[in-house]
């Protein structure tokens, strides 16, 4: 038989073993629980850490796209700056030469002026009349004179080409390359509206070409007694087209003898059909529509080197006069100078009517 003490010792050993097993199992469960908890915390931390990174990455990706969209919208709404015509701010040859410092009794704004009685050749007013200066579009009077002299068919169609586009001054024109007009229409626009492409096309299509035409311009000037004059092209855009007031009186007298030139230069407006649309041109001389003036022939001109220019045949106080104004200082001063001369002639130089 087992002793009581042995049984008790075995019982407690077994109990200790069971307790150890239970304790170990409990520890394992606790460890497993803590492990899961730690793992969950780690995973949660990773997710939390990843979310800002993901948001930052997405924001970073969206930022250039949003900026591009804003730039695109801005580009759409941005007003395009208007294209400006070339502005030439060079002083006139007359100003450089000091011609504006010369005074006259009428305080004219033109540095050169000459008023001559067409019938008697009496000089009523003279200011720097021998100075040789650029004459701008006054040139077109000589261009018109040659076209008229040549007796070319006025109904012949002429097409504007790239050669007629102004590359010297960058001046604008409503006559587009490819437009076709009759020679007579081009002559009308050149004289009345000072259309540069029209004048150039007239010279370019002259028999023999532009070079021959310019040579004939200079020959014609010499033939009619213009000794201070030189032409290099038919529009007046070049400052190398030069003359004096004395010579321009001669040119006006010669051109005035041609009825067609008188009629076209004093027209106040003209409509031309170009393709499927019409263009309305108006005179460059506002005195044409002034009832106080009786103008038989006229031409205006302007480039910066020449200043504002004006030549006219007109009748004032019973006298037929030729007026020349070159290198006028302002946009309207050539007209104001003409008005001063008209009032002066009416007051002091009226025609003397013979007693019968």
What are these regions (language model features)?
Residues 24, 29, 34-35, 106, ...:
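Hydrophobic alpha-helical segments and their boundary regions
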Residues 2-112, 347-356:
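N-terminal secretory targeting signals
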Residues 29, 33, 141, 314-316, ...:
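Hydrophobic alpha-helical segments, especially transmembrane helices
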Residues 70-74, 78, 83-246, 250-259, ...:
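Active-site-adjacent loops and short helices of periplasmic peptidoglycan-processing enzymes
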Residues 226-230, 236-356:
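Domain-terminus/edge residues, biased toward the C-terminal soluble/receptor-binding domains
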Residues 42-45, 130, 153, 276:
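Residues in and immediately flanking transmembrane alpha helices
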């Amino acid at each position: 038989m087992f002793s009581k003490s042995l049984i008790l010792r075995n019982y407690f050993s077994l109990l200790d073993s069971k307790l150890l097993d239970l304790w170990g199992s409990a520890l394992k469960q606790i460890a497993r629980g803590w492990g899961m908890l730690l793992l969950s915390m780690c995973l949660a931390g990773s997710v939390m850490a990843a979310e800002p990174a993901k948001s930052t990455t997405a924001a970073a990706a969206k930022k250039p796209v949003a900026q591009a969209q804003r730039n695109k919208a801005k580009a759409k709404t941005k007003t395009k700056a208007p294209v400006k015509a070339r502005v030439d701010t060079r002083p006139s040859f007359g100003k450089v030469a000091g011609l504006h410092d010369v005074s006259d009794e009428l305080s004219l704004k033109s540095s050169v002026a000459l008023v001559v009685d067409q019938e008697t050749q009496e000089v009523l007013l003279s200011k720097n009349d021998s100075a040789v200066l650029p004459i701008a579009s006054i040139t077109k009077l000589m261009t018109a004179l040659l076209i008229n002299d040549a007796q070319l068919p006025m109904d012949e169609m002429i097409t504007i080409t790239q050669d007629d586009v102004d590359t010297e001054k960058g001046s604008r024109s409503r006559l587009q390359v490819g437009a076709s007009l009759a020679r007579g229409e081009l002559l009308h626009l050149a004289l009345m509206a000072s259309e540069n492409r029209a004048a150039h096309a007239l010279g370019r299509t002259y028999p023999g070409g532009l070079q021959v035409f310019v040579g004939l311009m200079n020959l014609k000037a010499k033939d009619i007694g213009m000794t201070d004059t030189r032409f290099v092209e038919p529009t007046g855009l070049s400052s190398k087209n030069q003359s004096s007031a004395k010579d321009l009186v001669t040119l006006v007298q010669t051109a005035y003898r041609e009825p067609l030139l008188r009629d076209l230069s004093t027209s106040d407006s003209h409509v031309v059909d170009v393709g499927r649309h019409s263009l309305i041109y108006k005179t460059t001389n506002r005195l044409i529509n002034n009832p106080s003036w009786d103008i038989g022939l006229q031409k205006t001109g302007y480039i910066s080197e020449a200043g504002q220019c004006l030549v006219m045949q007109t009748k004032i106080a019973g006298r037929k006069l030729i007026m020349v104004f070159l290198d006028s200082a302002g946009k309207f001063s050539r007209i104001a100078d003409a008005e001063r001369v008209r009032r002066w002639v009416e007051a002091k130089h009226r025609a003397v009517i013979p007693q019968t």
